[in-house]
């Protein structure tokens, strides 16, 4: 920035500013609209008057923060010969919508760019309308004195200082750094960078300008769009948010096996543009719960508790960047993992889970419950031919939870893996827990009953049908469980996770869950965590709980809800 040195060293800072000529007071060359000069002078005169009256003491510099907006290839290439080496109209529209979006209609955003980036914008489009354009240049020959809504500065720091102080702090809502290469290399991953909005281009493209990768020890994905194909390129929009001030230090280990980065969750709603904040996928769940509570059908149910119900619902989660473990309340991650591994093992013995401190099946495995449904000869803890048995021994005759069923029935899970590996275009990659001939032997007929898998673009996706969904207690578990299953199968089959589509028949809220769910609805979401799977394990039957590491799970507190049995 072409900054002019302030030589009035002995006066209070605000008083010095009021005495200096206008162009020096903001330390940059800028060209305001004539209509804005009145407001600028009002700010300056007010500052001087309050300082003289002893009402203003400027002891510290305002905090200067910003967000980065960039499109990059997998190799983090962003340009070739000073131009974008791709033509993506959808990306340009996203950039425009993002940088124009404000929550206060009286304010605008600022876009910070290097001189070469400014010059690469066609003249008819510059300055970028509806935004304050801040151009960084140290060249004495660069002059935009007659251009409205443009400020020139010599560095990012000086530009941020300018924008964080009056008068700009009163009219600028958010600051976006948009390029070019040198500017982004300096700005990306700095502690003052609160969010990174990156258009991730899957295709390798010849570039000569590159930027660093996103520091995943300091940032977590907030949201990521499903892949878009345009002009032969596949890309997606991902926003990463800063969850700690630097990459130094270790995340804390939680008792459930997750790793937590210290997240200041309160800031996200104010930091992120609303169009980005609202894209958090947890809102798929929260909005469905809200809709059921507000407009659900009042129905009786098997347990006698009573429900509010809606029929025919769908949620679609993107597994490519993060893992959909709900954050508006704490979900029992260790329970999710151990139960899924229990399913995979084919076990029907609830005591196996009990011994690990997992008691989610206790209600349906108790002596009183089994007697109540007519299974009086069944040993306590024996759930009958439920999920795992159907996955691994479909069609086998069930005796009890102690029998060895090796080689009996049809192993649907191994069949799914074989088809994914050897016939990925098969439309019959299906696993069903619904076996009508065995329903009368089950402690509880399967709720999540049918899963189909789909392979495309090196990704594995899963669509699961759930006939009955307890939105308060069950669904958060179900989302995590089938997302984890999809991630495990992708890992075993050398693919990457794609989508998890959750289709629900009867989606219901129990009457005694309404109040705790309303409490949960008051909690804003936090970033979803990231899942890491032990790369050494490739056999579906070899996994243990320690093979799954959850990074950055920092949910709101646990919310108790009583299980309807």
UniProtKB/Swiss-Prot annotation:
Q: Which residues form a coiled coil?
A: none
Residue ranges, annotated region (Hinge): 245-280
The active site of this protein is located at 447
Q: Binding residues for substrate, per the UniProt record? A: 69, 91, 178, 199
Gene3D superfamilies documented for this protein: Dihydrofolate Reductase, subunit A (3.40.430.10), Thymidylate synthase/dCMP hydroxymethylase domain (3.30.572.10)
Its keywords, alphabetically, are: Methyltransferase, Multifunctional enzyme, NADP, Nucleotide biosynthesis, One-carbon metabolism, Oxidoreductase, Transferase
InterPro entries from the xrefs? DHFR-like_dom_sf, DHFR-TS, DHFR_CS, DHFR_dom, Thymidate_synth/dCMP_Mease, Thymidate_synth/dCMP_Mease_dom, Thymidate_synth/dCMP_Mease_sf, Thymidylate_synthase
**What's its EC?**
1.5.1.3, 2.1.1.45
Picking any one GO molecular function of the record gives: thymidylate synthase activity
Q: Where is the DHFR domain?
A: 65-242
Its catalytic activity?
(6S)-5,6,7,8-tetrahydrofolate + NADP(+) = 7,8-dihydrofolate + NADPH + H(+); dUMP + (6R)-5,10-methylene-5,6,7,8-tetrahydrofolate = 7,8-dihydrofolate + dTMP
The answer, when asked if NADP is one of the entry's keywords, is yes
Annotated stretches, region: Thymidylate synthase? 281-565
Which pathway does the UniProt entry assign to this protein?
Cofactor biosynthesis; tetrahydrofolate biosynthesis; 5,6,7,8-tetrahydrofolate from 7,8-dihydrofolate: step 1/1
An example GO BP is: methylation
Quote the record's binding site residues for NADP(+): 71, 77-83, 115-117, 136-139, 179-186
**What job does this protein perform?**
Bifunctional enzyme. Involved in de novo dTMP biosynthesis. Key enzyme in folate metabolism. Can play two different roles depending on the source of dihydrofolate: de novo synthesis of tetrahydrofolate or recycling of the dihydrofolate released as one of the end products of the TS catalyzed reaction. Catalyzes an essential reaction for de novo glycine and purine synthesis, DNA precursor synthesis, and for the conversion of dUMP to dTMP.
> Could you give the subunit structure recorded for this chain?
Heterodimer or homodimer.
The record's family statement is: In the N-terminal section; belongs to the dihydrofolate reductase family.
Query: Protein name, please?
Result: Bifunctional dihydrofolate reductase-thymidylate synthase 2
Gene that specifies this protein: THY-2
């Amino acid at each position: 920035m072409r900054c002019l040195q302030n030589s009035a060293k002995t006066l209070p800072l605000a008083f010095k500013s009021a005495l200096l000529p206008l162009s020096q007071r903001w330390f940059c060359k800028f060209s305001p609209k004539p209509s804005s000069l009145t407001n600028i002078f009002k700010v300056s005169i007010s500052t001087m008057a309050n300082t003289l009256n002893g009402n203003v003491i400027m002891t510290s510099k305002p905090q200067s923060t910003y967000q980065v907006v960039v499109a990059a290839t997998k190799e983090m290439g962003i340009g070739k010969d000073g131009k974008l080496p791709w033509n993506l109209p959808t990306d340009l529209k996203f950039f425009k919508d993002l940088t124009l979006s404000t929550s206060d209609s009286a304010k605008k955003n600022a876009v910070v760019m290097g001189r070469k980036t400014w010059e690469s914008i066609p003249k008819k489009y510059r300055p970028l309308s509806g935004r304050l354009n801040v151009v960084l240049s140290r060249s004495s020959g660069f002059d935009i004195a007659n251009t409205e809504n443009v400020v020139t500065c010599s560095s990012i720091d000086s530009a941020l200082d300018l924008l964080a102080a009056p008068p700009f702090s009163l009219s600028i809502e958010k600051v976006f750094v948009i390029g070019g290469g040198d500017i982004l290399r300096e700005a990306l991953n700095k502690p003052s960078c609160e969010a990174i909005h990156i258009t991730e281009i899957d295709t390798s493209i010849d570039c000569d300008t590159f930027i660093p990768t996103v520091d995943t020890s300091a940032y977590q994905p907030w949201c990521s769009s499903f892949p878009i194909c345009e002009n032969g390129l596949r890309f997606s929009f991902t926003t990463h948010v800063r969850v700690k001030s630097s990459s130094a230090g270790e995340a804390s280990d939680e008792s459930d096996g997750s790793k937590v980065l210290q997240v200041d969750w309160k800031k996200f709603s104010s930091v992120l543009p609303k169009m980005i904040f609202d894209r958090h996928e947890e809102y798929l769940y929260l909005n469905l719960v809200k809709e059921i509570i507000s407009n659900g059908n009042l129905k009786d149910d098997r347990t006698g508790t009573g429900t509010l119900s809606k029929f025919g619902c769908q949620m679609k989660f993107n597994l490519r960047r993060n893992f959909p473990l709900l954050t508006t309340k704490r979900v029992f991650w260790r329970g999710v993992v151990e139960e899924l591994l229990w399913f995979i093992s084919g076990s029907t013995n609830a005591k196996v889970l009990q011994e690990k401190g997992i008691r989610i099946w206790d209600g349906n495995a108790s002596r009183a419950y089994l007697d109540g449904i007519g299974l009086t000869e069944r040993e306590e803890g024996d759930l009958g031919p439920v999920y795992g048995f159907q996955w691994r021994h479909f069609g086998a005759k069930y005796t009890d939870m102690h029998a060895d069923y090796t080689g009996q029935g049809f192993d649907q899970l191994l069949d799914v893996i074989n088809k994914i590996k050897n016939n990925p275009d098969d439309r019959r990659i299906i696993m069903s827990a619904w076996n009508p001939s065995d329903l009368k032997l089950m402690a509880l007929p399967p709720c999540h009953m049918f899963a189909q898998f789909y392979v495309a673009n090196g990704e594995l996706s899963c669509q699961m049908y759930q006939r009955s969904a307890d939105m308060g207690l069950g669904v958060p578990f179900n989302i995590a469980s089938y997302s984890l299953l999809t991630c495990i199968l992708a890992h075993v089959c050398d693919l990457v996770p794609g989508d998890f589509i959750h289709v629900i028949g009867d989606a219901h809220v129990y009457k005694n869950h309404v109040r705790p769910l309303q409490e949960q609805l008051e909690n804003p979401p936090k970033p979803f965590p990231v899942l890491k799977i032990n790369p050494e394990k490739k056999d579906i039957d070899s996994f243990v709980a320690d093979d799954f590491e959850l990074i950055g799970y920092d949910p709101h507190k646990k919310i108790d809800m009583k299980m309807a049995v």
